Amino acid sequence: MPTINQLVRKGRHSKTTKSDSPALNYAYNSMKKKMNYNPAPQMRGVATRVGTMTPKKPNSALRKYARVRLSNLIEVTAYIPGIGHNLQEHSVVLIRGGRVKDLPGVRYHIIRGALDTAGVDGRKQGRSKYGAKKG
């Protein structure tokens, strides 16, 4: 425990927290060819690869994912939630933060029902999370 004199001289340092979704924190200025710190809740991107991957140890499945080049030129791996999807290469998608616990390196989710991504067909409950219309 520090003495009062040590606290007067140095003070307390607050811990710096790392972002859970660092790619959403920067915007690219194409005129200046520079990255600016400009945090955003979502970001648009183009799918460069769509595929499946297998989850970590206790789980077993084929999880759908897309490799996305964002509008700030950063390329990330994003999870495609829900049953079935219509994404292919060059589809324009909207991503949000949020990792998938059993897929290493997947820190983003694709928002269903936005831009080129269709909502989940025949979904009755939790529709707003999957871009499904009523009925």
From Swiss-Prot:
Pfam families: Ribosom_S12_S23. GO terms for biological process: translation. Keywords: Methylation, Ribonucleoprotein, Ribosomal protein, RNA-binding, rRNA-binding, tRNA-binding. The keyword Zinc-finger does not apply. Part of the 30S ribosomal subunit. Contacts proteins S8 and S17. May interact with IF1 in the 30S initiation complex. With S4 and S5 plays an important role in translational accuracy. This is Small ribosomal subunit protein uS12.
